Amino acid sequence: MTKQPFYKSLYVQVLVAIAIGIALGHWYPETAVAMKPFGDGFVKLIKMAIAPIIFCTVVTGIAGMQSMKSVGKTGGMALLYFEIVSTVALIIGLVVVNLVQPGAGMHVDPNTLDTSKIAAYAAAGEKQSTVDFLMNVIPGTVVGAFANGDILQVLFFSVLFGYALHRLGSYGKPVFEFIERVSHVMFNIINVIMKVAPIGAFGAMAFTIGAYGVGSLVQLGQLMLCFYITCLLFVLIVLGGIARAHGFSILRFIRYIREELLIVLGTSSSESALPRMIDKMEKLGCNKSVVGLVIPTGYSFNLDGTSIYLTMAAVFIAQATDTPMDITHQITLLLVLLIASKGAAGVTGSGFIVLAATLSAVGHLPVAGLALILGIDRFMSEARALTNLVGNGVATVVVSKWCKQLDEGTLQRELAGEGNASSPASDIPVGGREAV
């Protein structure tokens, strides 16, 4: 097979687009800010297809299983993995911020901070309790779940639909085949949308640099540097160790999903790569039913980057405002975040809302301190989103292996660059994942 020129690779195109966006934002900030609709438009196009893709993938995955016990086992294994790894991420963030103490010596008086810009985040955070979160998983209407694009609500309905379709047996086969064909159509739509990914990445990055300026990267830089290094070490050491224990290399895995990582880097939302991740993980050898359950669920229950951010940001605010935090306060913070972090969706800004909710719930920490990190939160969201994406990908492979639903040969071939999915020039193939 003849390789297409490197400049036609989505990986190269997005990388160049991000570089141009940064340059435009630095030299012509006013023009760069006007590019925001390109980034917003691309993310909206992706979100438009997420709900039906999740529905089709989950329904065909569950309905096509031999036994419902397999679904229960997969869900249980996934939740166990999510809880263990996200707890480790929270603890790592807590340990690092206590060792480095990036907020020490700032001596900020919370009463002097401008809280007008954080009012919306604080209000949104106060509204979300644990009971509210659990009740919100059940959609008011099926149409409402799809219209609002709520991942957990769509997932909840999809699991019920898939279970009901499975119970129908051969009588439900025409419905199963129809949904499978719709799935191919939806992945072709994503293939078309991804053609404009470089434009979306350019617009989002240009706006970020133009609106906040490169100078804002220097302000509060110690916290940002500390956070980025922690995320990097978490991916290489923690996720790398998990990957090695399950027979694959984290570096090869990162190379395999490099295009998705660049899309996330440009948009700062791990959700923007969700459809392609579902397709990529299936091509990696993970069973369709496992991918359909683990990837969407992970966007609320397995946000490793967000977990690191939440503990580091909360303790940073305490350090900067000279708010004492003894071991009891920190354990309380950890326990609150074990619950609150599960309510963060993989969309831009959700981590900041959960942080506001956490500060309100703990009570000991000044909510006004959010104003300290509001300016750099947009830059930190990129590290969060990248870590979240890698974490969910690793989780899918691990859970697939635990459930004996992983094709080891395909996994090794794809990660070695010998398969079609790992080729730099490959997008989602025209015609879907396979001919219908």
From Swiss-Prot:
The primary gene name is dctA2
Q: Which PANTHER family match?
A: AEROBIC C4-DICARBOXYLATE TRANSPORT PROTEIN, PROTON/GLUTAMATE-ASPARTATE SYMPORTER
**Keyword Transmembrane among UniProt keywords:** yes
Q: What is this protein called?
A: C4-dicarboxylate transport protein 2
Q: Topologically, how does it sit relative to the membrane?
A: Multi-pass membrane protein
Q: Which InterPro entries match?
A: C4_dicarb_transport (IPR023954), Na-dicarboxylate_symporter (IPR001991), Na-dicarboxylate_symporter_CS (IPR018107), Na:dicarbo_symporter_sf (IPR036458)
Q: Name one GO biological process term.
A: L-aspartate transmembrane transport
Its GO CC terms are: plasma membrane
State the UniProt keywords alphabetically: Cell inner membrane, Cell membrane, Membrane, Symport, Transmembrane, Transmembrane helix, Transport
MF GO annotations: fumarate transmembrane transporter activity; malate:proton symporter activity; succinate transmembrane transporter activity
Protein family per UniProt: Belongs to the dicarboxylate/amino acid:cation symporter (DAACS) (TC 2.A.23) family.
- Report the source organism: Pseudomonas paraeruginosa (strain DSM 24068 / PA7) (Pseudomonas aeruginosa (strain PA7))
Residues crossing the lipid bilayer are 14-34, 45-65, 77-97, 142-162, 198-218, 223-243, 290-310, 331-351, 353-373
Q: Tell me the PROSITE patterns matching this sequence.
A: NA_DICARBOXYL_SYMP_2
